[in-house]
Amino acid sequence: MAGRTSTYAPNQVTIVINHAASGISHTLTGFSEDSIVSVERLVDTFTEYVGADDTHTRVFNANSGARATVSLAQTSESNDVLTFLHEFDREAMSADGMFEMLIKDNSGRSLYFSDEAYIAVIPQGGFSNQMNTRDWVISMTNTTFQHGGNQKVSPATADTLTALGVNLDARWL
């Protein structure tokens, strides 16, 4: 149904890290003004192969890894948590340094989850006459991707999603 107004609330995006080895659970706070987080797959799901005789094959890539870039203001206390998680991982040099990571838009249906994530790139430091951003690059293995909308779905879309095996929460119908 056209004409439905959607609502996206940036302050409803949550990023939660659970680190089993230390027992901590931390919700990241203090995001930058212009960006919160971006998530991208490491590789295409399928790669096209074309033979010399123009036969086409798609090759499935099972790699479900992703990279998330989390943008925090330099004043965010979450910078401290991520710094010391990174140090824990460097010293552990084992799976004990990895953590679960959930990125969720609570004003919509998008979510991204990995049960094995780790800090791949720590941000550059810098200071100026303005607020600086710290961009943390986090590698996520076994990533679940769910790109979802932020408005109620039409009956036709609900039927389509049901046919695809999706069970929508009643608030979206």
UniProtKB/Swiss-Prot annotation:
InterPro entries: Phage_KPP10_Orf10 (IPR021695). It comes from the Viruses. It holds the Pfam family KPP10_Orf10. Keywords: Virion. It is found in: Virion. GO terms for cellular component: virion component. This is Structural protein ORF10. It comes from Pseudomonas phage KPP10 (Bacteriophage KPP10). The lineage of its organism: Viruses, Duplodnaviria, Heunggongvirae, Uroviricota, Caudoviricetes.
